[in-house]
């Protein structure tokens, strides 16, 4: 220990050797290192050394004045020498790792398949991108490919089987990824094209459509339907004329039959004015018992131009809405007479029973 201390010029504040006192100046780095690697000896050892050689060691302390001026060894002594060594190793390993990464990047860029790999990656970026973005990506790919060709012409390409396998596998993965990205986009575009075609099909001028629907309709159908409903005008500007004429020719018969069917349904819902007036006249004459016989229904059908089903439906609805049996007629309904049979007992305001004929009201 004395040799280490003497080498760094470190002893106690005062030392006794052969009865003489020697004073030495403290070396700051020596004090720091001695404090780390050589702590003060225990009291028993100090007593033995004093008895044997007459030399006494005082505990070594850190030179705080040296710490104030930023002595590096003293700063390490204030922390941990092992931590400092570990950090130095980590920094060295990190630098080595970074160097390896840069070397791998350089090998990938200089590989002959790098241009294909880059093109596959940019193709993935182009999926769904606006045209101007896709154009910029194409220009970037061309520029990088030109640079790589120049570099390969100067340096040449080194073969490395593992790197070749990596480049091929990664390129295949990017191609499949682009296909997965493109598939839903293509399906969406196809759907939009179908919708556009259907809209173009519907974009037929209202006038032409009305002419088709009106063909084959009789004057009676138009009166029975209460007049033809005006269709809204549709602007056919920009529609392909050839497609329009083709569709009109193909579906004109179907549209005409559809028009006739709709007219019949409207006719059933609302009877012609003249026919309805004749039925109302009969209703007023037979208000007390508005149940026409079968022969009367046939006569009404002939005079109005309606069928028997329309006649029956009109009288049923009219009785439900506008007629209530009189008190004298209630017993006819309560005794279970059918309205058709009951009409045979009622003639010109008289009701016939077993006792003869008598007048109601």
From Swiss-Prot:
Question: Which InterPro entries does this chain map to?
Answer: ELK_dom (IPR005539), HD (IPR001356), Homeobox_CS (IPR017970), Homeodomain-like_sf (IPR009057), KN_HD (IPR008422), KNOX1 (IPR005540), KNOX2 (IPR005541), TALE_homeobox (IPR050224)
| Phenotype upon gene inactivation | Early termination of shoot meristems, reduced leaf formation and reduced seed setting.
**Biased composition regions of type Basic residues, renumbered to the chain:** 19-28
Tissue localization of expression = Expressed predominantly in shoot apices. Also found to a lesser extent in glumes.
**Example of a GO MF term:** DNA-binding transcription factor activity
Q: Where in the cell is it found?
A: Nucleus; Cytoplasm
This protein's GO cellular component annotations are:
cytoplasm; nucleus
Q: What keywords sit in the KW lines?
A: Cytoplasm, DNA-binding, Homeobox, Nucleus, Repressor, Transcription, Transcription regulation
| Any one of the GO BP annotations | negative regulation of auxin mediated signaling pathway
Q: Which residues bind DNA?
A: 263-326
Predominant location: nucleus
Q: Where is this region: Disordered?
A: 11-48
Pfam families xref list: ELK, Homeobox_KN, KNOX1, KNOX2
Is DNA-binding set as a keyword in this record? yes
Query: Any idea where the ELK domain is?
Result: 242-262
- List the PROSITE patterns: ELK (PS51213), HOMEOBOX_1 (PS00027), HOMEOBOX_2 (PS50071)
Q: Domain of life here?
A: Eukaryota
What is the recorded function of this protein according to its Swiss-Prot or TrEMBL entry?
Answer: Transcription factor that regulates genes involved in development. May be involved in shoot formation during embryogenesis. Overexpression in transgenic plants causes altered leaf morphology. Regulates anther dehiscence via direct repression of the auxin biosynthetic gene YUCCA4. Binds to the DNA sequence 5'-TGAC-3' in the promoter of the YUCCA4 gene and represses its activity during anther development. Reduction of auxin levels at late stage of anther development, after meiosis of microspore mother cells, is necessary for normal anther dehiscence and seed setting.
The entry assigns this protein to a family as follows: Belongs to the TALE/KNOX homeobox family.
- Which proteins does it associate with, and in what oligomeric form? Interacts with FTIP7.
- According to UniProt, the name of this protein is Homeobox protein knotted-1-like 6
Species classification: Eukaryota, Viridiplantae, Streptophyta, Embryophyta, Tracheophyta
